[in-house]
Amino acid sequence: TFGNTSDFGDLLSTNTAIAGLASNTRGIFQGGSNPNTNVIQFITISSLGNATDFGDALKSCGYSAALSNQVRGVVGGGGPTNAIDYITIAQTGNALDFGDLSNTGEFTITSEMINRVLLHQLVE
């Protein structure tokens, strides 16, 4: 149905091209551009309020791809990195290394299936 918007709260920074993922209880925002940052922040979905610091990503970048289930969040690619990070959504802390993409590039996208994930990059 159509309706009006209302203010939920504010993020810690005003970067663009932030990667987003979620569980049923938390929304996670990682990185961003203008300038590139490695900040990970979160909101609690069930209550209004500003974002809170979650930890740091391994690299500072924007235009990354993000995906998640109820336990883990994975963020990969973006400019200028090929790193893939992961976090445990229920626990705050810094991201851990999940591996690397074969190329460095922005505009990474994801495709999720039941038991596999594909990360695709636009390589110029």
What are the functions of these language-model segments?
Residues 1-124:
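Polar, enzyme-active/binding microenvironments
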